[in-house]
From Swiss-Prot:
Entry-linked InterPro entries: Chitinase_II/V-like_cat, Chitinase_insertion_sf, Glyco_hydro18_cat, Glyco_hydro_18_chit_AS, Glycoside_hydrolase_SF, Glycosyl_Hydrlase_18
Organism: Metarhizium anisopliae
Role description: Secreted chitinase involved in the degradation of chitin, a component of the cell walls of fungi and exoskeletal elements of some animals (including worms and arthropods). Participates in the infection process and directly acts in the penetration process of the host cuticle.
Stretches with biased composition (Basic and acidic residues): 413-423
Ranges where the record places region Disordered: 380-423
GO biological process: chitin catabolic process; polysaccharide catabolic process
Main location class: secreted
Cell location: Secreted
The name this protein goes by in its record: Endochitinase 1
Keyword Glycoprotein on entry: yes
Amino acid sequence: MPSLFAQSLAIIATLQATLGLATPVSAPDTVIGKHAGGYVNAVYFTNWGIYGRNYQPADLPASQISHVLYSFLNLSNNGTVYSGDSWADIDKHYPNDSWNDVGTNVYGCVKQLYLLKKANRNMKTMLSIGGWTWSTNFPAAASTAATRSNFAKSAVTIMKDWGFDGIDVDWEYPADDVQATNMVLLLQAIREELDAYAAKFAQGYHFQLSIAAPAGPANYNKLHLGDLGKVLDYINLMAYDFSGSWSNSSAHNANLYAIRANLNAPFNTDHAVNDYIKGGVPASKIVLALPIYGNSFQKTNGIGKPFSGAGDGSWENGIWDYKVHSKAGADGIYDDGDKGYYSYDPSVKELISIDTPDITKDKVTYLKSKGLGGSMFWEASSDRSGSQSLIGTSSNKLGGPDSTENLLNYPDSKYDNMRKQMA
C-alpha cells in the first residue's frame, strides 16, 4: 500500500503490461450476492497522519465505515510483527487521557480507535502489516513454517492486546511462484491462529483476514488467486496508480474501463476484476479500492498526451489530496466512457486525474452489478467532509456499511484498560 508516491515511483516495473479493451456493464444498480451484513466500506488510517496532516482517529466518519485498516505495522525477516511507531500507536496521550492511571495501559491511536468501536458497533478495526516500504522482509518471513508461525502468533498477539478485529496483510508483491505459494501458507497460518484465539477467548466471533492486492497483471498473474479466495475474507483490489510520473503520457489514475484507445490507458479496473474472478476469487470477496487523491501531469496538451514532470503536491510531488486538489482556472472533465475524471488548466498545461463523488457513485454502481464485496479507500486524511466526501458518497450509495458487529471483550490483553473495555 502506498506512502503513496514515494512508493509508487518504485512501481515502474509493474506498469509495463497493457490491458485489453473492456465493454462497460449496464448502469442500473443490479445487486448480485450481497453480503448478509451489507457491503464493506473500508478506509486506511495512517498512523503518520497524526503528525503533519493532523488527522486523528476521532476525525474518522466512523458511522459510515465498516472497517478501519490501521497502517502500518512492520515485520522482521524472522516473521516477528511489531509497531513501527509506538508513540503514535500506543503512547500518545490525547486530551482526555490521564497521566495518573494505575497499571499497564494503552493510549495513542489504539485507545482512540477502541473508543470509536464502542461508540460505533459496526466499525471494525484491522491491523495492516507491511505496505510498500515495509514489504522487504515478507519473502523471508513467509519462507518457513517457523517464520510463518512467528508472524501469525506475533500478529495475533498485537491484535488482541490492541483490541482489533482482524489482520490485513499488505505484501507488495510476491515476485515468483515460490513467494506466491508461501504467501498462501502464511495466510493459512494466520487464519489458524485467529481461529485458535477465537475458540479460547472469543467463542462465536470471526476475526477477519484480508490483503491488499495489485490491479496490474504483471503482479496478480503471479498470485494463486483461487487459494487466496479460499483463505481470505476480503481481497482489497488496489484499483489506482494506473498512471503517474513514471508514465510516458498523461492518463487516468483509476479508470473503470479503457474503451478509448487514444487515451493510452495502461490499465483499467474492469479487466483486473474479471481476471480475479476468472482466477477463482469469489466476486463477493473482492473489495474495490478507490483513491482519495489525484496524480498530476505538467506541460501536457491533455489526457493521453506526453507530459514533462509531475509538479507539486499536497505532501509529495505529483500527488494532490482530494480535499485540496481544486485549482483556479482548471476545467473539470468527466470521461463518461472510461469512467474517469480529471481537471485541466490550458494556461499552464497541468492535468490532475482524480476521483469525484460522481465517479465514486459510478464505481459503486459497478461493484454492485458485479456482485463485489464493497469499497475501500486510500486514505482517510485526504477526504472532504459533508456531501463531497468520497467515503460518505460510497456509504450512501451502498445503503450504509456492513452491519456486522465488532468485538469489545479482550480478556487476554496485556493492557489493564483494554481488559476493562476502557471503563
